[in-house]
């Protein structure tokens, strides 16, 4: 009987209910905030890959116009140097660049290369089961044919 009277008394008590409700909702709210931040960072990193590829394409094209013919390894190294440089500051361990001569040459008087970049993006959401993300971007590079 004593037990039921204590439960009846607690049922009408509202002090501390806010902290209990916050304790129940806080993990969800924090996960949503971290998720929103994570999506924003992933979008920024994807746009960085696009900008790096464009900047590398311009650099390689200008080098060819100066009669400095770069091989695919030099093109990849130049792209990595741009990626880890001041504007983008991507981790060199997480960036991979592959430059290959395209199988089908679409433009007469030019050589077409395919620049493919992959980036292992950092993941801050492993605590809620989000898997690691690898971002990838590919674009053609056209240089004057010699």
List the predicted regions and their residue ranges:
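Alpha-helical assembly-interface signal, strongest on the long, hydrophobic N-terminal helix that forms
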Residues: 2-80
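Short, conserved structural patches
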Residues: 2, 54-146
């Amino acid at each position: 009987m004593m037990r039921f009277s204590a439960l009846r008394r607690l049922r009408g008590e509202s002090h501390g209910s806010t902290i209990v409700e916050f304790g129940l909702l806080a993990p969800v709210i924090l996960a949503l905030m971290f998720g929103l931040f994570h999506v924003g960072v992933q979008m920024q990193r994807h746009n960085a890959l696009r900008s790096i590829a464009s900047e590398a394409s311009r650099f390689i094209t200008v080098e060819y116009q100066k009669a400095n013919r770069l091989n695919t390894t030099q093109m990849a190294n130049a792209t990595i140097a741009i990626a880890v440089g001041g504007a983008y500051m991507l981790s060199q361990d997480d960036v991979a660049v592959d430059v290959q001569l395209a199988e089908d040459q679409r433009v007469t008087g030019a050589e077409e290369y395919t620049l493919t970049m992959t980036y292992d993006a950092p993941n801050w959401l492993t605590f809620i089961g989000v898997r690691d993300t690898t971002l990838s971007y590919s674009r053609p590079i056209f240089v004057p044919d010699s």
